[in-house]
Amino acid sequence: MSDREQSSGNTAFENPKALDSSEGEFISENNDQSRHSQESICKIYTAGKNNEYIYIGRQKFLRDDLFEAFGGTLNPGLAPAPVHKFANPAPLGLSGFALTTFVLSMFNARAQGITIPNVVVGCAMFYGGLVQLIAGIWEIALENTFGGTALCSFGGFWLSFGAIYIPWFGILDAYKDKESDLGNALGFYLLGWALFTFGLSVCTMKSTIMFFALFFLLAVTFLLLSIANFTGEVGVTRAGGVLGVIVAFIAWYNAYAGIATRQNSYIMVHPFALPSNDKVFF
């Protein structure tokens, strides 16, 4: 597996309804209702002696030049190779996210009775924040809109979270005599991130199981922590912390999937695609 996992053979098109093996045969019909100022992709077909060429609309690609949906690259769907040749930044961003999430979630789970979360500020500002933000910008340079949006956004989340616990920003001081207002404010803050993350998880429903699980369970974690701040229930906070630890390990799993290759590891990650949902969704 290379840093940017590529499709080979027919692995990207195992569903016979999605791709016919006969040369030049159209797979999907033109959509007469989709007419925009720019040409929309309305057909996919193969060509060549061994069906080595794939046409997406009027664009021609070698089959081996297309990337499959893969959590190790934060690529949620079939995509052509990027123009810019950089290393895969997704494992770096995922690692920063995973470590910071793990530390904060252990606090939320009340591991060892810890109640003061300030130790996470360093991770949040630098590894989970700055490093993840840089990785997201790198993803944008690689033409991965989803990866760039996800990593830059969560890098910003960790920077903003760290700022809450830095006295210079004066955020906690503003709520010194109004703890209920602070709980409600943090509840709305986390609720917004839950809604955003649910939106991202919808965009991973045609990818792999671990890729989808990362974003869906993260959204549930945000939702639990939001409810905990609204209600003040420690049990809900601990539930969010336990689920956050699981999310951290899933993020590390996806990061490892993007790093491990046949040249550097004996243990390879084989992604498992989500079941076909062509008949369930639009």
From Swiss-Prot:
Region described as Disordered: spans on this chain: 1-34
A Gene Ontology term for the protein's cellular component: plasma membrane
A Pfam family matched in the record: Gpr1_Fun34_YaaH
Keyword Transcription regulation belongs to the record: no
Ranges annotated as spanning the membrane: 87-107, 120-140, 151-171, 185-205, 208-228, 239-259
Residue runs in coiled coils: none
Organism domain of life: Eukaryota
Extracellular side: 2-86, 141-150, 206-207, 260-282
UniProt keyword annotation of Phosphoprotein present: yes
GO biological process: ammonium transmembrane transport; monoatomic ion transport; nitrogen utilization
Phosphoserine modified-residue sites: 2, 7, 21-22, 28, 40
Compartments it resides in: Cell membrane
Cytoplasmic side: 108-119, 172-184, 229-238
Induction / repression: By external ammonia.
Membrane topology: Multi-pass membrane protein
Modified residues (N-acetylserine): 2
Family: Belongs to the acetate uptake transporter (AceTr) (TC 2.A.96) family.
Chain's role: Transporter protein required for ammonia export. Involved in acetate resistance.
Stated name of the protein: Ammonia transport outward protein 2
Source organism of the structure: Saccharomyces cerevisiae (strain ATCC 204508 / S288c) (Baker's yeast)
Record lineage: Eukaryota, Fungi, Dikarya, Ascomycota, Saccharomycotina
Gene from which this protein is expressed: ATO2
